[in-house]
Amino acid sequence: MEPFYYQHLEKSEQTIYHAIKTGLMALEDHFLVPYADPARISMIFFLVRLDCPEIFYAVTFKLRKWPQSDNLEILPEYLFDKKTIRQQQKAMSARVEKLARAVSTKTELEKELYIHDFICENIHYDKLKKPYSHEIIGPLGHGVGVCEGIAKSVKVLCDALGIWCIIVISEANPEKKIKYRHAWNIVKIGKTYYHLDATFDLSLSKTLTRHDYFNLSDDAIFRDHEPIMTEHVPCTDGSHFYYLEKKLSFTKQEEVKKRAAQAAKKKKPFLFHWRGGYLTREILKKLLIGIEEAAKEKGKQAKVSLNWMQAVLCVEFEDMDEAVAVSMQKSDDVDNVEIEQANEGELL
């Protein structure tokens, strides 16, 4: 199947795309492309790297125009010398093959979950934003990455496992204090498209592996994501949303209290999604009261954190005699809830 972004280019642009891809794969020092607006060539170069995350070593280029020529010459700027690139290509291929082999016989949904959890449990967000963290060698080679490198790693693993996957990009929004563009994935499971943002879940996975952004619809993802600036497909179905699949998505307050009591008894964390209408402060207050009552019945104190935009609550329980300042703080107080930031890497 032709690469996604390649399919959405005009014929003349596909010729440029092919020349760029061929030149980069061959590690050419320079190569020709048909003349076009430099800004458009830059965008096509960018799209090649979204379609082909295995091209991790070429991040920018210079253009040269020769008099009386119908072509432009591209001079790629490589992150490493060619010997190092070839060594890293072998290492990345072996790494991807090994990771993919572990779930090669699983279902598409199981493979997707494996990739997501691998990212959340093994990769650290690189707040220094080193150049290689934007490429697959960051997460897969060094265990660190930013959203672009993480989304590319998800795609290269999906490609290896036969899962349809693209990388999508949203613009920055300084008015909302969003300093950087953001990258995540759209995957196709069965015949349905879903948003998958492993970076946001990684940011939330401090004590538990989170799945707040696993298989979201457009309606859900754009509660806290900016509009996509690249070509993409609509995601109208949220039926494989993780918490829905795991029966951890509730519409009734009594359901939440019952499950909280079970978790408190076992002294296990309780992670759930609320879909019983918009999560207002009033509804949150009622949920917190039920959780606190369930905790006290089991001799526990509840500590609650909240991803408010996605209506996901994380509840942890501790013994009453271990609770800090238990007489001074009530966990059923909305103001005592920790508000989580899933997009901390993109904020100003």
Region annotations inferred by a language model:
Residues H142-V146, I150:
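Secondary-structure capping and boundary motifs in well-ordered enzyme cores
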